[in-house]
UniProtKB/Swiss-Prot annotation:
It comes from the Eukaryota. This is Trimodular acetylaranotin synthesis protein ataIMG. It comes from Aspergillus terreus (strain NIH 2624 / FGSC A1156). InterPro entries: Aminotransferase_I/II_large, COMT-like, Glutathione-S-Trfase_C-like, Glutathione-S-Trfase_C_sf, Glutathione_S-Trfase_N, O_MeTrfase_dom, Plant_O-MeTrfase_dimerisation, PyrdxlP-dep_Trfase. Residues 23-37 have a biased composition (Polar residues). Its cofactor is pyridoxal 5'-phosphate. Its EC number is 2.6.1.-, 2.1.1.-, 2.5.1.18. GO terms for molecular function: glutathione transferase activity; O-methyltransferase activity; protein dimerization activity; pyridoxal phosphate binding. S-adenosyl-L-methionine binds at residue 625. SUPFAM superfamilies: GST C-terminal domain-like (SSF47616), PLP-dependent transferases (SSF53383), S-adenosyl-L-methionine-dependent methyltransferases (SSF53335), Thioredoxin-like (SSF52833), Winged helix' DNA-binding domain (SSF46785).
């Protein structure tokens, strides 16, 4: 036993109290850090508004901390006598601080019903029993509300009766109101609202005001436990206030004083309090939704930071509870055990009434999702807003999206889109698709009236924008309202003004991506051309949708040239390539090249090369394109005096005619320039030339062999200018025929159109359908391949859909069960076995497709075309 003779009686009492709580005088071993990062739910810490408070405190300390800061503390100290009564459930921390610091003996007044902790009758019954049976003289009642962990508020009647109880027995009533501003139950009409004891007219009740006190601190409502600053409110006991204030005047730091003063006098204090309540409610909803989803019983709360729940219903003893606590800790979760609260020691947890937990799990799941999304939204528009804008929405030239955040954002967006598809009513899904045209036309109107350009100098009202643009104010307001609801433009409700956001800024006429050209061209002429799609589907129609819309037989290249639209088309396509370059740079490990050179074939104006060279300054690169493109690109890389511009170290430019498709041709062309190609990287969306350069033109060739149609196969240079007359983008396949009646020339391009034309001319219905039902199925699946699924980028999704279709009983082919049709030819090239290999997947994961592809490959016409296809043009 240590020698205590040198200690005062007070110190001896304090030491004995500490030992009672397990503290030892021996030196403790240095604590070891856990290798895990646990979720710590064991401490009542309020983190909901910590980012806002941290910002406020940092600014305060930078501007206000100096040598002359005065300290006027109002400490939260309870210097009680030798006994006090406390209502429970209460945290074990109360026992420690009252016993060690104030050296009083707490007497618990157990709560009989945890669901109705502050029932006036039950509360008074418990207080009376504790007072009458206490082995110590009672001097005060400490009432904590809203309480930890129940999160319930005292009713007005309970507070009045408690005050009267104390007055009749000459006791002090100490109301712990540290959660006073954390009441979030206002939306619940049946919830008991928070009322402070100081809001009552206690004199009218005949109570002694000098014996009623309120304790409050910064620790809970504002999550500032580290400031160690609080206050005691005693309206009629100046002697008590003096006794508390003077002895503790040196115990409050200047930092705590500065931060607390800044917060409590801030003009934003009401907003911070409101935000705190809002976020606490969201967190509470998320917690109880999870509990309900798993059938866990809990006590509904309306205030504070805790939810009291029966996580281990099988636990009957303290040892059971401790064992469960250890299992949670091993799993990475720390939480306060029920034995940390006085009531649990007395078995009060057995009186938790089961909630009516719904058997249906969808509602709590949606609550969890909603609360999580609301919290994410608050973070993304609040403390994370600056990082979000910098990482994902900085579209200045050469600026790249953060690769990791971009990937995470894309994954999240995909999930949200899937959730939207699952939850959105079908009528709204159709409305969204149907009204998409309206959204596009509103966007076109904003570009046409130069609204993004007019907002460059700052926010403007609708009337100001209307005056500057020449638009009608009322209709312009309708257009802008629709656009800002879709994330384009930013609106200040207080000042009723619009301003550019990162999205609308990209529509400025001087923006390097030239998005305004895309909107203008595709949102007007291309959308107008789309109106011809229904008419183009009719059998016997030879005009394309664009020709139908413009009522012309000219190819679109000739028509665009005649209308003077071709320069704008080139600017649009060039701007699009430039806009895509940052994404390509972010997606691929260009640093693997080190200081070696690479060749960008068909690189246009060199946007990709420019970005790569700026990011990786030791890398060298070459641009391979037509002479006219090279001459234009040269001006972008070289300054007038011949020095390299800011775009980087471009060591060589070469040009070549013709359309290079195979790796062998790439190596030949590079060899002529003195380069040696050591590595060829395939970009996302690019396809292996030797196996897939013929992927489209084999479709009509197979049908021609199946129908035994006499034909002449011509191999042409698609880069030649004359080919614009055949195809507006100089692509293959295209076919030329003669009308059997008028002898007029017939030109058809695009593989699906070629299939349909050949079938219309030479098929008896075998490949297109012999009756209405068959024709409908063939037409639908053929159109779906090109219109809905796309060509390259959606292969995996396409295969999943085909697998589901072909897995049906007796469904040996796509459109019809018993025979192939042009629908099978439409899908077949993209479902060849080597396509699966190219994308790094196993065709055996799609067994129905594998069986179907083998049936198609076994057809003589398919074998004949597949044998000749790779050699065409090589």
């Amino acid at each position: 036993m240590a020698n205590l003779s040198g200690l005062s009686n007070r110190s001896r009492t304090t030491l004995a109290s500490l030992r009672r709580f397990g503290f030892q005088t021996t030196q403790q071993a240095k604590p070891t850090e856990s290798s895990k990062t646990p979720i710590d739910a064991s401490v009542a810490e309020n983190w909901s508004i910590r980012p806002e408070l941290l910002s406020l405190f940092q600014e305060t300390l930078q501007t206000e901390l100096g040598a002359q800061v005065r300290i006027r503390p109002r400490p939260r100290i309870l210097a009680l006598s030798h006994g006090r009564n406390t209502n429970t459930v209460s945290a074990d921390g109360f026992d420690f601080h009252f016993g060690v610091r104030a050296q009083v003996n707490p007497v618990a007044a157990p709560i009989r019903d945890l669901h109705d902790a502050f029932n006036p009758d039950g509360l008074l019954e418990s207080l009376t029993a504790a007072f009458d049976t206490s082995p110590y003289p009672i001097r005060a009642v400490v009432l904590t509300y809203p309480g930890n962990p129940l999160g319930q508020c005292c009713s007005a009647e309970a507070l009045r009766r408690c005050a009267k109880f104390c007055h009749d027995r000459e006791l002090h009533l100490i109301c712990d109101e540290v959660y006073a501003l954390s009441y979030f139950g206002a939306a619940d009409s049946e919830a008991t609202p928070f009322q402070s004891i100081v809001s009552f007219d206690l004199n009218a009740m005949g109570c002694d005001l000098s014996r009623v006190h309120v304790v409050w601190s910064m620790s809970k409502d504002f999550g500032c436990s580290g400031l160690r600053l609080g206050c005691v409110i005693s309206q009629a006991n100046p002697e008590l206030i003096l006794g508390l204030r003077v002895p503790t005047s040196t115990e409050v730091s200047s930092l705590s004083t500065l931060c607390s003063t800044a917060l409590l006098t801030s003009a934003t204090l009401p907003d911070i309090i409101e935000l705190n309540v809002k976020r606490l409610l969201l967190s509470y909803k998320a917690v109880i939704a999870t509990l309900e989803c798993h059938g866990v019983e809990y006590i509904p709360a309306t205030a504070g930071l805790c939810v009291f729940a029966r996580l281990a219903p099988e636990a009957k003893t303290p040892d059971d509870e401790i064992g469960f606590q250890h299992r949670l800790r091993d799993s990475g979760l720390l939480r306060a055990s029920s034995i940390s609260y006085n009531s649990m020691v007395k078995g009060s947890s057995d009186k938790i009434r089961p909630n009516n937990v719904r058997q249906k799990k969808m509602e709590p799941t949606l609550k969890i999702l909603g609360a999580s999304l609301q919290e994410a939204l608050s973070q993304l528009t609040g403390p994370l807003n600056k990082e979000r804008l910098a990482a994902l929405h900085d579209h200045s030239e050469g600026r790249l999206v953060d690769a990791n955040l971009g990937e995470a954002a894309a994954y999240t967006i995909d999930l949200l889109h899937q959730v939207e598809q699952l939850l959105e009513p079908s009528s709204l899904v159709l409305a969204d698709h149907f009204l998409g045209y309206l959204n596009t036309k509103c966007l076109c109107a904003a570009v046409e009236f130069h609204i993004p350009d007019l907002l460059v100098e700052g926010p403007k009202s609708v009337s100001q924008l209307a005056q500057l643009s020449g638009a009608r104010a009322d209709r312009l307001g309708q257009v802008l309202r629709l656009l800002r609801n879709n994330g384009i433009f930013q609106y200040d409700t207080e000042n009723a003004t619009y301003s550019n956001n990162p999205t609308s800024s990209m529509l400025r006429s001087d923006h390097w991506t030239q998005w305004h050209n895309w909107v203008d061209l595709y949102g007007n002429e291309f959308y107008d051309m789309a109106r011809g799609i229904p008419a183009s589907l009719k059998q016997g129609t030879t005009r394309t949708p664009a020709q139908i819309n413009f009522n012309t037989d000219q190819c679109m290249f000739d028509y665009f040239t005649a209308q003077g639209w071709l320069p704008r088309l080139h600017r649009t396509l060039g701007g699009g390539a430039t806009a895509q370059a940052p994404g390509i740079l972010a997606d691929y490990p260009w640093e693997d090249f080190g200081d070696g050179p690479f060749l960008d074939i068909g690189g246009g104006e060199g946007a990709l090369i420019a970005l790569i060279l700026r990011r990786h300054t030791r890398t060298k690169a070459a641009l391979l394109d037509t002479p006219r493109v090279i001459e234009h690109a040269r001006t972008l890389f070289l300054s007038p005096d011949g020095k390299l511009s800011r775009y980087g170290d471009l060591t060589m430019m070469v040009s070549a005619d013709g359309q290079e498709r195979t790796e062998a041709e790439w190596r030949t062309l590079a060899g002529r320039t003195g380069w040696e190609i050591r590595t060829i990287r395939k970009l996302r969306g690019a396809w292996p030339s030797d196996e897939t350069s013929y992927i489209n033109y084999i479709k009509p060739l197979i049908l021609a062999h199946e129908l035994e149609i006499p034909h002449v196969l011509s191999v042409i240079d698609t880069k030649d200018e004359w080919f614009y007359r055949i195809h507006p983008e100089r692509m293959v396949p295209s076919l030329k025929d003669q009308d059997p009646e008028t002898k007029a020339e017939v030109i058809v391009f695009e593989s699906t159109a070629c299939l349909q034309y050949l079938a219309d001319r030479f098929d008896d219905g075998t490949w297109t359908g012999r009756n209405a039902a068959e024709r409908g199925s063939v037409l639908s699946w053929t159109a779906y391949q090109t219109a809905a699924l796309g060509l390259h980028e959606n292969c995996l999704r396409q295969w999943d859909i085909l697998e589901k279709r072909l897995a049906r009983d007796g469904q040996e082919y796509i459109a019809l069960k018993d025979r192939p049709t042009i629908a099978d030819l439409s899908y077949f090239p993209f479902s060849m076995p080597w396509m699966f290999q190219f994308l790094g997947v196993d065709i055996k994961d799609w067994p129905s497709i594998e069986r179907w592809s083998q049936r198609m490959l076994a057809r003589p016409a398919v074998q004949a075309v597949m044998e000749m296809g790779p050699q065409i043009g090589h």
